[in-house]
Regions:
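Extended acidic/polar, glycine-enriched regions
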Residues: 38, 44-47, 96-156, 184
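Glycine-enriched alpha-helix->loop->beta-strand junction motifs that scaffold or abut catalytic
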Residues: 354-357, 373-380, 400-406, 438-441
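Surface-exposed binding patches on compact interaction domains or structured appendages
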Residues: 2-15, 43-110
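Aromatic-lined carbohydrate-binding surfaces of glycoside hydrolases
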Residues: 122-124, 128-131, 140-356, 362-372, ...
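Beta-sheet-dominated interaction scaffolds and their linkers
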Residues: 1-41
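Substrate-binding cleft of secreted/luminal carbohydrate-active enzymes
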Residues: 423-473
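Active-site clefts of carbohydrate-active enzymes
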Residues: 399-428
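Catalytic domains of carbohydrate-active enzymes that cleave complex glycans
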Residues: 298-306, 310-330, 334-365, 455-557
Length: 557
């Protein structure tokens, strides 16, 4: 009736999973770990995951209730389907609901486990059946053995996760007022799992329509507004520009309280999209920056239109962050400049305001990286360009240092990515690849950006399903995590464990085991025509599990 299977398997529809059964699972002490439970039903059935006997509309129908018997902390979840670009339903959502009809056939459930006690513990799944007002009967039970090591998972997740936050999208999807109390309640709900996953960066949108709404005005299928709106409220009073920072400060405080504010990134000041299609309105400045201002003197809204006023606007932002003692962790973010010259005007302007400003780039175009001779701390480079550097096809500045950088993927490449169509092992591999590259972390442009409809297949010619988000908008403003996000989170903690092992055993010992899973950097190559990465990394759950167990045993000696 059930079997335990690896957490890295993605179910297609209600088909049986093509994988081996698990009887045992290894985990570090205090490590959250997971398996999936493959359930077979011979008919559509109402299923409860809690003690409460919830009923469908039909009333006291035949139902199943799951119960977990273990000294281990456990929680069981339903998994939900998402329609992928190939029009095939695939499991990706870890659902918050506690009861549901499950269809005839196979359904995967998600089981999370965590223990602070060393030893081999039984995790027994019991299934009870009842109908009408009859007493329950135990119809099936199965036990997984969880081996918990005496070695503890590192308390601090040092992985430098840098997922971009789209706060305006949350207001749209829940239809609440932008930057209202209700909006901030939802924002905090969504930031909590992000912080738990190792997020270190607080993103501040400080102009209007950054990224030009991802050029959503060009998309006529699944029409959606994807614009971001300024966290700051600029206004003119008695002829002077003034800024209301209340929403910005409130978001910073949320991030600080959650422990995800080691760095602040300012978006929308330079390197902003899009000159060609979303117009330049500043009279003597070539960046397509738009800052909407409420002129209280005339009771009208306008935009900043002169370089002088824009300079004053940026100066006040910088001064505010200095006053809040946040300047030393602040960086001005520019997204994918094609070359150094494209952002030189913006750099000159902000350096004129403060010469100690730190600028950060997400590098997609090799020409920029080859000609940039500044500090690259916390920069991020797309995977295919990193491979070019390693293969000698792209030079990097002498000041460049990959150890203080992150890497990223986006709509490209097609593999080693985190789409719904991607193998889940590719999300887990992020932590291991980051260790292989000897980098500090990983950046991605997505976390919670959604189309206006419930059809998540937006711009499939450009963005594969899942490219825009890692979590789903659940009811009551609470996110539902994806299988992809869970694997990414686990991989981040694996990275922290690998770094801990390195401090005790040496990098050579740890890297030798990691390479069995990731392969060598020299084996990686990128095909520009197919947008695919070739390499010797393995989609092998058992191999991945064995690395952690071997390292834990070495630490015991």
């Amino acid at each position: 009736m059930i079997r335990f299977i690896p957490s890295t398997v993605r179910q297609i529809g209600n088909l049986k999973n093509n994988c081996e059964e698990l009887n045992n699972k290894f985990a570090l002490k205090n490590e959250e770990t997971s398996v999936q439970i493959e359930l077979f039903l011979d008919k559509k059935t109402w299923v409860n995951l809690d003690d409460v006997l919830t009923l469908p509309w039909e009333g006291l129908v035949e139902n199943l209730r799951f119960e977990i018997e273990s000294v281990v902390d456990c929680k069981l979840y339903f998994e939900g389907d998402v329609l992928d670009d190939d029009k095939i339903y695939k499991k990706d959502v870890i659902l918050n609901k506690r009861s549901s009809y499950l269809p005839k056939g196979y359904s995967n459930l998600w089981l999370e486990m965590k223990s602070d006690t060393e030893g081999i513990h039984n995790v027994t799944i019991k299934i009870f059946k009842s109908e009408g007002s009859d007493d329950e009967e135990l119809i099936f039970q199965k036990t997984l053995k969880l081996e918990v090591s005496s070695i503890e998972i590192p308390e601090k997740n040092i992985f430098y996760l840098d997922l971009w936050q789209h706060l305006s999208s949350l207001a749209r999807v829940y239809d609440v007022e932008y930057y209202s109390d209700e909006h901030f309640r939802i924002i905090e709900n969504f930031m909590k799992p992000l912080a738990d996953a190792g997020q270190k960066v607080c993103d501040l949108i400080v102009s209007d329509y950054s990224w030009a709404g991802q050029e959503c005005f060009k998309i006529y299928d699944n029409q959606s507004s994807l614009y971001e709106y300024n966290l700051i409220k600029p206004y003119i009073k008695n002829g002077k520009l003034q800024l209301d920072f209340s929403a910005l400060d409130r978001f910073i405080e949320i991030c600080q309280n959650l422990g995800m504010c080691e760095e602040i990134n300012l978006f929308g000041i330079i390197g902003n999209w899009n000159r060609g299609n979303f117009s330049v309105i500043l009279e003597d400045f070539d960046e397509p920056i738009k800052v909407r201002v409420h002129n209280l003197d005339s009771s009208k809204f306008t935009f900043i239109r002169t370089k002088k006023m824009y300079e004053e606007y940026v100066r006040q932002i910088f001064e505010h962050l200095v006053e809040k003692d946040l300047w030393n962790i602040t960086r001005v973010m520019a997204d994918q400049p094609r070359n150094v010259g494209e952002v030189s005007e913006g750099e000159d302007l902000i350096r004129k305001i403060r010469d100690d400003v730190k600028i950060k780039y997400a590098i997609m175009h090799g020409d920029f990286f080859e000609n940039y001779d500044g500090d690259t701390e916390n920069f991020s480079i797309i995977l295919n360009e990193y491979i070019r550097v390693q293969n000698g096809g792209l030079k990097m500045s002498d000041k460049s240092n990959f150890q203080n950088m992150t890497w990223y993927v986006c709509w490209t490449p097609f593999n080693l990515n985190q789409f719904v169509k991607s193998s889940l092992i590719e999300s887990r591999l992020v932590g291991y690849m980051t260790y292989l590259f000897d980098m500090k972390g990983f950046l991605r442009w997505n976390y919670c950006l959604y189309p206006d409809s419930n059809d998540y297949r937006y711009r499939p010619d450009r963005w594969a399903c899942g490219d825009m988000f890692f979590v789903y908008p659940g009811k009551s403003g609470v996110p539902e995590l994806s299988l992809r996000f869970k694997q990414l989170s686990y991989g981040n903690m694996d990275y922290s464990f690998l770094r801990y092992c390195e401090s005790k055993l040496g990098r050579c010992t740890v890297l030798g085991l990691v390479k069995e899973f990731t392969g060598e950097i020299a084996d990686l190559s990128y095909n520009e025509q197919t947008r695919e990465i070739s390499g010797s990394y393995k989609d092998d759950y058992n191999l991945m599990e064995s690395i952690k167990k071997k390292l834990a045993l070495k630490l015991k000696k």
